[in-house]
Amino acid sequence: MSHEVQIHEAQTKILRELLFLPETNFASLQKVSGLESDHVKFHIKRLVELGYVEKQGAKYRLSIKGKEYANKLDTDAGVIERQPKVAVLLIVERKHDGQKQYLLQERRKHPYFGYWGAPTGKIRWGESILETASRELAEETGLSASFEYRGINHERVRHTGTGEFVEDKIFHLMFTNNATGSMKSEFDGGRNAWRTMAEMKREPKKYKGFYEEMEAGIEGGAFLEHVQEYSKEEF
């Protein structure tokens, strides 16, 4: 869930000004906004309501929340910088009939509809990486496990038709071979299955970084960075 709201360009200018000052007065904020007095009052009031700005006497300054928000600004462009998504990728291993199997998921939502790969999940605000791994496993599979950190994978996805990056993700690779419980076969947005790597070689629709991610998560000590290309139909 996002904890941020879209703000007006004038409000962004006000936050940028306050980012470089301990505090300042109304006249200074009006000057940087380029607006008439009534309009500036409206925008400052809105920033106070959002909890980004505090007023003390005749002075204005950033609140703790405002400092954190304004620090994300690209100060040249005056917009919030777009940043990579940060998530966990779970390598869950078990032995069954003498073979190593891995808990994998078929994605049943866009993007990558129908693709197979390891479970993933975004890290929530204030949540540790280990907490995320345990929560995501429980929510999507019904299983419980303790995880080991095995490495990091920075994956950027480029659209083959336009050449533009459509995704930028940082995955923390988490490994376990001690999962317990009864696995859910389906969840909101996909289905789960235990599969061997040999079975996955015959699977036509799997993420393009699948083997690199799995090997890195199994072996450990990984630092991966790569660009994957997907067409409009694949994405």
Task: Label every model-predicted segment.
Residues M1-I14, D74-T75, I80:
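Short alpha-helical segments that sit at the start of domains
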Residues V5, E9, E17-S37, F113, ...:
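Nudix hydrolase/Nudix homology domain
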Residues T12, D76-G117, A145, F175-N178:
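N-terminal strand-loop-strand
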Residues S33-E49:
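Short amphipathic alpha-helical interaction segments
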Residues L35, Q99-E139, L143:
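Conserved Nudix-box catalytic region and its N-terminal flanking loop in Nudix hydrolases
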Residues K59-L89, E164:
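Acidic, metal-coordinating catalytic segment for phosphate/diphosphate chemistry
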Residues I123-F147, H154-F210:
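Unchanged
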